[in-house]
Amino acid sequence: RSHWAQSQAHKDNKINYSGCGHTRLHCRYTTKQRTPQMQYLCTANSTNTKTGNVPSIWIGATRKESIQSCVDVGCPLLHKKAGGQGGGDNNLCYAQHGTPKMAHATMCKSAANGKDYSLSNAILHGSRAAKMVRVGAIGDPAALSPIDSAYIRQTIKRAGLSLVGYTHGWMMKTARHWRGSLMASCDTLEQADQAIAHGWRAAVVLPYDHTERKITTPDGHTVIVCPAILQPEIVTCNNCRLCDASIPGPVIGFPDHGPGRARKLQNQKVTK
């Protein structure tokens, strides 16, 4: 992996792939210099205790661009003020409206000043213990161009790593090339059944107070709660990788952990 990453990093730094977010220069336009194209930034390491220390891909080279990726796929977890349905009594995106947005804002400034956030560089300098790349630490990967999407999949595969990521854009025709790579992010068990029927593996948001470890969808598909949530002291995404959509598996359930979860729990205690 190290030899390949060094070779690929050298190529990325020498070649200007116009319009592709995987270059060192992060070109913003297509070869015709007309259509703005969604970019992405890649980091080698992570302090996220749930995922483990793995390379990560952040969608958007600006905060506005990242939020736009969520608007483009119609993500309901985006705050109402930003064009989604989140906030109030509805679930709210942890990444775009929690602490990850601050880290992303810092990265955007560094990228504008020339810091190398290419995927090859992230893989080259990633931990040797990393077994996966997290695709979509913020933003939605389905908003990326087909060319960038193919590059990401091929680069991760050639590095011998698993790809783990999610998209709310699974119902879009333009996201079909991500089937078998990304998990379909679903908001209900019924949606999970729909995603599976269309060839996706599914992940689903569960109520914030969900306690059961295993349930079934209306169509009878098994749903298990994310092992890294159940046993955070011993399980990380890096050593679990059940969300590698290239491998058959159950629906993965995630109890709501958005910014409003603490308030909901407090309200629940008050009403008891």
Predicted regions and their residues:
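Intrinsically disordered, low-complexity segments enriched in serine/proline and basic residues
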Residues: 7-11, 23
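Intrinsically disordered, low-complexity polyampholyte segments enriched for Lys and acidic residues
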Residues: 11-16, 32
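Intrinsic disorder/low-complexity segments enriched in small, polar and charged residues
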Residues: 21-22, 35
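Class I S-adenosyl-L-methionine
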Residues: 29-272
